[in-house]
Amino acid sequence: MPYNFTTIEKKWQQYWLEHKSFRALEPREAGDAPKSYVLDMFPYPSGAGLHVGHPEGYTATDIVSRYLRMRGHNVLHPMGWDAFGLPAEQYAIKTNTHPRATTEQNIANFRRQIQMLGLSYDWDREIDTTDPEYYKWTQWIFLQLFNSYFDPNDQKAQPISRLINELQNENLVVGPDGSVRTNPNAEGLDEIAGDVRVERLWRELKPDEQQDVIAGQRLAYTDEVAVNWCPGLGTVLANEEVIDGKSEVGGFPVERRPMRQWMLRITAYADRLLSDLDALEWPEPLKEMQRNWIGRSEGAHVDFEIIPPDEHVRQTDANRGETIDDGEDDDLSITVFTTRPDTLYGATYMVLAPEHPLVDRITPSAHRETIEAYRTQCAARSERDRMAESKEKTGVFTGANAINPVNDEKIPIYIADYVLMGYGTGAIMAVPAHDERDFEFARKFNLPIRAVVMPDEAWLRAESPSPNFDALALSTGYLEDAGNFKKAFTGSGVAINSPAIEGLATAEAKRRIIDKLEEDGAGHRAITYKLRDWLFSRQRYWGEPFPILLDSEGNAYPVSEAELPIALPEMTDFKPTGTPQPPLSKATEWVNILREGRQFSRETNTMPQWAGSCWYYLRFIDPHNKQRFVDPVKEQYWMPVDLYVGGAEHAVLHLLYSRFWHKVLFDLGHVSTPEPFRRLVNQGIILGESEYHTVEETPRKVTEAEVEKKGSGYVLGSNPSIRVESQSFKMSKARGNVVSPDDIVKDYGADTFRLYEMYMGPLEAQKPWNTRDIVGMSRFLNAVWRHLIGDEEAPVGGTLRVIDGPIPEALDRQMNRTIKKVGEDIAGLRFNTAIAELIKLNNEMGKLASIPRPLAENFTLMLAPLAPHIAEEIWQRLGHERSLARQAWPAFDESKLAESTIELPVQVNGKVRDKITVPVDADEASILRTASAAPGVQQWVHGKSVKKQIYVLGKLVNLVVN
């Protein structure tokens, strides 16, 4: 009869909780045991609970953690909840409940589901990012950022007090743009720029100017930035949260508008974030995603002088509070960054981002109405929508022109939505012959397309409208009219139509043209990054409050660390105001603060959901410490995380933000490692069950029961002439393909569920769920139970099928090979092949009348990380009083790893007629005798003459007969 998995699993889950079986030892308790920190990306506890895809990574880390404990490691394997965020707040508003209440309910459900799966977490370390005792330290880390700056000389964060001392001591000076730089000549500062003083000393600045300088250097600062504002949600959204001009949550309209936001200066760490990737044991595609997000580019900044319009612009810019008078714009220029300065001679127009501040200053009145209409249109679109490759190019001529610095050619200036203010300088030189977007734009607006790099013949022939021309005709045609070709040539080649660099290969042409720009004062070498500073504030209630006070001028002051945590006020009305004023602004008693006779207000924005997840791995190390965010001795013992497992959807932002915070904490001496996560693995997505559609003029959905397999595909059972396609999709409530682990565990048990998820395929692979396949793992576990226990009535402490006796030699060898292979596979996260080895060994065990105790115990120990409940029960029934959670992993005998026998196919005249099993050290003569006597061979050689006997060593025997 089947074993009673429900009773057994509840019994052992309760045992593990009561006995704290998986408690990680503190450093002082661990002795010489090696440490292993195994971490999951902790979940956001949604109201829907877990579906079967979520536990895949949790099960993988659980198996590794259990295996490492059995190998004598001190394992830290914790779990917690990333519980702040917009979805919780939206649900609370929708249901008229407080987000804290719904969050607590969701956490309780997630905890129940996770414990139901037998995951070996140290529950004494459970954390919740919405707990004031947790976000007290999130606020503390923010203060470290606020009170620090990035020293470009040391390439690290330093206390802001150090910067002030350097300025007061006049080792540093302040540039005209507010930047801080080394004082090149403290004694002769007046001579730095002749008679004109360029830099200023600290003592020469007014107090408000000094405050502005320091604010401009902090790692946490405020700035007026263009954001995706969603009035319906009452908050700013990231680009990833906006689709076709609407919010991903709720589908509300989104508009671009400037707003005061908190920013974190992650760009200062771009080089370190990039270079330190090389030493990490992460998947290469994931590292490449981070490299691309950081986007380091080498090239040049080039200055294009603007030709003053015939009619000067007269306007007052309300945002800047300044008036533009006649003549003021005579020396304006536009700076662009380009990675291809060698194509400068091919720049035939310029494009500014619609938000570029120069647009107002260079646009004459005749063009202003058109420009403003286009800018309004662009403001309704997210950056992601604007950058979509497939969309048609749009733009408007400003009425102004610029001078190309290498050939003095007059070129028009446009604005277009495919240029973004946040990338580079917010302006580009357009080289349509050698950039695809510029090429499409130039074709649409009938702008010149001038080739300045010659492609190879293969490209010319592939993209020419006349591919049958000879090589000379192709190159001549390209020189004369590159716009007639199918697309832009974006590769390297030889410079053409470029007097200063004619005939040079691309690399040398770049170097020469930059030299020329620097000689002419028209540009210089530069390195830029796609990475932008991190927009760190949200206009919502359910998030960490900033530990910041604002005076009447809007200047920011940190609260003292003794005041932390700044707790969220209790509010019954936390709905968004529909304006940029966040919900917290309605808590007037909480907002307004009187300090030393001065009136202050609390910052009413809250931190983004990323904040709590940036450092949670550190709090797990020391979750109950009220004096420090982590004890330094414990941090030094446990860090870095040895194995971090989570979804690829967090490949960029979460990991990049965590690495940034960690590096700041490292620079300031709060942590001991420069990187947080040594090894990272992304589990593959488990898709919903396969869906079937007919392939016909009007496709229709059909059930699996209506489908038949035909060759490598499917057909409709009732009409085999109609082909059927199978496809799997990501699980979602909207699609109706969500499978709950509660249902699977109820019907099959947690151990069967765990084994099935791990047996579906490689951990990193994407794979479809199929409930019908689970029965295979259920049969396996029931077979294990029958082979070792016999039936459910076996008494505790005794067994029906286990004996004290030796293991048969062949099975002993297989057992030793299995111990080695399963251990290696678990360490390498190859769980599907580990399970396959156990299935094979169990099949051989089933051939025995009774199971020798050493085989039974070793098999149970190997099964334990994968199916822990049934393994614990069998272990106890084998007579052991203590849990096997910390039993030693079985050792294998090296001398027994080799096979004692080999199986050889026997051919007669080249066709296999039988197989024989012979000792691995048998000589050729005995092998040939055995082969000739095999029953399957005898019927083919009887009465015939064997002309030749062939033995291919270790491979086969072939008998050649008349």
What are these regions (language model features)?
Residues 26-103, 127-138, 338-339, 405-441, ...:
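N-terminal catalytic cores of NTP/NDP-binding nucleotidyl/phosphoryl-transfer enzymes
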Residues 61-62, 74, 356-454, 483, ...:
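Catalytic alpha/beta core of large soluble enzyme barrels
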Residues 82, 153-159, 216, 220-228, ...:
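Helix-rich, typically C-terminal accessory recognition domains appended to large enzymatic cores
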Residues 285-335, 380-409, 413, 534, ...:
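Flexible, glycine/threonine-enriched loop-and-boundary segments that flank and lead into catalytic domains
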